[in-house]
Amino acid sequence: MAGLLVAGTSSDAGKSLLVTGLCRAVARRGIRVAPYKAQNMSNNSMVVADPDGHAGEIGRAQWLQARAARVTPTVDMNPVLLKPSSDRRSHVVLRGLPYGTLEAGEYAHGRGPLIEASRAAYEALDEAYDLVVCEGAGSPAEINLRAGDYVNMGLARHFGLPVALVGDIDRGGMLAAVFGTWGLLEEADRTLLAGYLVNKFRGDVEVLRPGLETLTQRTGLPCLGVVPWLDGVWLDSEDTLRVGTPAPTVRDAGPRLSIAVVRLPRVSNATDIDALAAEPGVDLTVTTRPDLLAAADLVLVPGSRSTLGDLSWLRATGIADVLADRAAADRPILGICGGYQALGRTIADPDGVEASGAPGTTALIEGLGLLPVHTLFHAEKSLGRPTGTWRGHAVTGYEIHHGVADVDDDAERFLDGARAGAVFGTMWHGTMEDDAFREAFLTEVAALSGAAWRPDPAAPGFDARREAMIDTLADAVEEHTPALLDLALSRVG
C-alpha cells in the first residue's frame, strides 16, 4: 500500500496541520496524493461528491487537505464522520451519507460496518492515487480502545503503513508523551513507528537537542523534524467556535465593525465565522454575554446540531430577549442554518429528528418570531451546493440540514431565506467565503448599524489567504521536516 500514517500523542497535537502541509509539499512534485482520515468526530463538515456523484459529507480538515493536495475532495477521504448531538450520542455519516445514530454503549458492537467502509475507502484511494497520507485520531496509545481500532495503529497494521508520531511541545510534556506512547504500544505496533516529530516549538532548537537525543536512545525512534511555531496559520475549525481565527495579519487603524457570534452549546459548521474574522477592520468575538451581544454592530447566530435544544438555551440565558430588542431597534442579526430556523416563527418535528417523544407526537414549537419563516424537520437530510445572487453578486454555498424552511410569500428574500428589517436568515453555509458577497453584506450591516467601516479594496481575498496558509505549512514541512517528506516520497507507489 502506497501510504503512511501521521498519528499524534494527543488530540490537537498538529496532525491535521502536518498532513495539510505534507499533501501540498508532495503535490508540488507532481505526485497525485490524497488525504485520508478513517474516522473523524466533528460537527463541522463540508459537502462534496460521493463516488456516484451525489452530495455527501466529510470533515472540514479533509476537505482542506484535499485542496492542499490539489485534488477534488471525495467522501472516501473521510469515510466515517461522527457528529455528536449530545455527550453520549452521535449521528453517523458513512461514506458521505446518513447511516443512523450510535449511543456511547452501542459503538463497541456497532462499528463493524464502519470498519468495513473505512477500509474499502482507503483501498479505493490507494488504487486511484500515487500516495495516501493518513491522519490518525486522538492518540494511538488509547490501549483501552486498541482491540477495535481502525483509525490509528489498527489502520497502520492492517495496511502495513509506517507511522510518524507528532507531539505538541507548546503544551509541555511532549517528550514524556512520545515516550509514553511508545511504551504503551504493543511490540507489533511499535515496529511500524518510523519516528517522531516535534510541533509548535518556540526558541533555540539546540536547547531541545539533548532531550531529543535521549528520547531516541531510549526508544530507537529517530526525530523526523522540529516544526517551529507558525504565526498566521489556522485550520478550518473541527469542533468549536474559535475567537478571531484567522485574524487579519495587521490591525489597521481605520473604522471598525464589531461582530458578536453567539456561542451555542451545540454549534455546528462554525467555520462560517472564519472569513468574517479575517476581514480587515472587523473585530469578531464569540460570546454568551448579553452585553456584548447587545453592543455589537452585527450578531451572528450560527448553525446548530440541535436547533430545538439551542433554541431553549437562547431563551433560558436571556439571549433571546437581546435578539428581540435588536430586531425591534433595527440592529443587524444574521442567522445561518439552525440559527436561521431559531429566528423563525415555528418549528415542527413530526418525525422526532431532534425532539424527544415518539414520531408524530411532537407539537409545533414556537421560534423567536423574528423572521417570517416556518421550519419543518424531515427524517431525510438535505445536502447540496446551491448557488444564487444577492444585490447582483453571485453566491455559492453548501447546505446540510434536516429542517426545510418555508418563507412567507410576501417576505423579502435573502438568498434562499428571508429578511425582516435588519434580521437576515439563510440555510446556506459558506457564503461568507465569497469576497464580493461578504463585503457587500458587511457594507449593508455597517449602514444599518451606523458604523463608518468600509471594505479595503487592497486586502487579499479569503481564498488567497487560505492558499497562502497552505503554502506556509508546505514550506515548513520542506524546511523543517525533510525526513518526513523523504518518508512520504519513499512510499509513492
Regions found by a protein language model. Name each.
Residues 1-325, 332, 349, 379-380, ...:
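Flexible phosphate-sensing "switch/lid" loops adjacent to ATP/NTP-binding sites
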Residues 344-345:
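Short glycine-enriched nucleophile-adjacent loop
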